[in-house]
């Protein structure tokens, strides 16, 4: 029996497949969009599908790494169509799954989590625009995630928060 699961799949760019965040509509391709959704939305959805059967019925927490750019209401910059859309779809999947998890498990909480900019291969091409104090180590990121999960109101089915514990709008 598992009481906490953290789903960390995701990608923003893939040099081998020549996939990069789109800056304009003309940059869109069906192949890139399909890859974004396969990795950022479908894979976590399949994890949610299988985890519901093995999670602790009295204390289940599932967090999916999402991104603030997956917030529909917070999108003021545009661009990054595939990544944004796939993360927005992930957030809807988490929100929808939280309803079923609550029905099937006595105490379940699902979370879409924006970790900030983490010093990994995902963010490498974009780090030059990030202030040093806003570029987090994987260790710090993991500790913040666990800390924020422990502080959440378990009576609320689903949360979308960032590394500071602030609510991110859907």
Q: Which residues are covered by each model-predicted region?
A:
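A glycine-rich helix->loop->beta "capping" turn
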Residues: 1-9, 13-14
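Hydrophobic structural elements of the Rossmann-like NAD(P)H-binding subdomain
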Residues: 6, 63, 110-113, 123
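Catalytic loop of short-chain dehydrogenase/reductase
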Residues: 11-42, 46, 59-104
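A structural motif corresponding to the C-terminal end of an alpha-helix
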Residues: 46-54, 97, 107-108, 151
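Glycine/proline-rich active-site loop of Rossmann-fold NAD(P)-dependent oxidoreductases
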Residues: 58, 76, 152-156
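Ser/Thr-centric signal marking residues that sit
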Residues: 86, 117-120
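Conserved Rossmann-fold SDR core element
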Residues: 91, 101-118, 156-160
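C-terminal helical subdomain
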Residues: 112, 120, 124-170
């Amino acid at each position: 029996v598992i009481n906490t699961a953290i789903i960390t799949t995701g990608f923003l760019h893939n040099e081998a497949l020549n996939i990069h965040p789109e800056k304009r509509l003309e940059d869109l391709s069906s192949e890139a969009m399909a890859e974004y959704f396969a990795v950022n939305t479908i894979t976590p959805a399949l994890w949610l599908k299988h985890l519901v059967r093995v999670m602790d019925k009295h204390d289940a927490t599932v967090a999916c790494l999402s991104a603030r750019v997956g917030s529909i209401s917070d999108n003021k910059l545009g661009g990054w169509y595939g990544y944004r859309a796939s993360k927005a779809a992930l957030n809807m999947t988490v929100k929808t799954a939280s309803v079923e998890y609550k029905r099937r498990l006595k105490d379940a909480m699902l979370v879409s989590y924006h970790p900030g900019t983490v010093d990994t291969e995902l963010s490498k091409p974009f780090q030059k625009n990030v202030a040093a104090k806003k570029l987090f180590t994987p260790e710090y990121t993991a500790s913040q995630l666990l800390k924020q999960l422990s502080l959440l109101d378990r009576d609320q089915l689903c949360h979308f928060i960032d590394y500071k514990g602030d609510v991110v709008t859907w």
